[in-house]
Amino acid sequence: MMAIRELKVCLLGDTGVGKSSIVCRFVQDHFDHNISPTIGASFMTKTVPCGNELHKFLIWDTAGQERFHSLAPMYYRGSAAAVIVYDITKQDSFYTLKKWVKELKEHGPENIVMAIAGNKCDLSDIREVPLKDAKEYAESIGAIVVETSAKNAINIEELFQGISRQIPPLDPHENGNNGTIKVEKPTMQASRRCC
């Protein structure tokens, strides 16, 4: 019997850093060069194995534009994890990332797993944010950090695997609704015939 855990994950960060592209690459293994900016938020799901569980990621991709910033708490409330994305070629996006982390720490779920994704690592020749800086910052806040490229499918799966590994295992003695669905193989039963 394999348990399916539903894990709400939100993506936060500046507009244009590649949040939607990361989600599309992870869920659909697709990259769109002409993707439109997200309005409000978009939603996708993907289920992946993790140990003896299945993690069903309920992924909320939030808009990065300032005018939608006030909607973000609606998406990170109740989240098991948050992926805060910055563009390695834009120092300003790394500064904004720190504001998102501060907001999550003040208003987000207490035990939220935080992952920092430095996207567009395929453009490392025009890098503005050293990986060393991202690693030091991630360590200081207890987050995982991964450099990704949605365009070239670099470390996208690893990002979500890292989140899965940080999610505490289910307590087998816990009662109640914890977002888990039991999946069992159907058993063959002898059929009864009437008449």
Swiss-Prot record:
Pinpoint motif Switch 1 by residue range: 30-42
Q: What is this protein called?
A: Ras-related protein Rab-31
Cofactor(s) in the UniProt record: Mg(2+)
Q: Which residues bind GTP?
A: 16, 18-21, 32-33, 38, 64, 119, 122, 150-151
Domain of life, per UniProt, equals Eukaryota
Q: Which reaction does it catalyse?
A: GTP + H2O = GDP + phosphate + H(+)
* Primary role: The small GTPases Rab are key regulators of intracellular membrane trafficking, from the formation of transport vesicles to their fusion with membranes. Rabs cycle between an inactive GDP-bound form and an active GTP-bound form that is able to recruit to membranes different set of downstream effectors directly responsible for vesicle formation, movement, tethering and fusion. Required for the integrity and for normal function of the Golgi apparatus and the trans-Golgi network. Plays a role in insulin-stimulated translocation of GLUT4 to the cell membrane.
Organism, as annotated: Homo sapiens (Human)
Q: Where is this motif: Switch 2?
A: 63-79
Tissue specificity, in the record's words, reads: Highest expression in placenta and brain with lower levels in heart and lung. Not detected in liver, skeletal muscle, kidney or pancreas.
Q: What is its EC number?
A: 3.6.5.2
Broad class of where this protein is predominantly found: Golgi
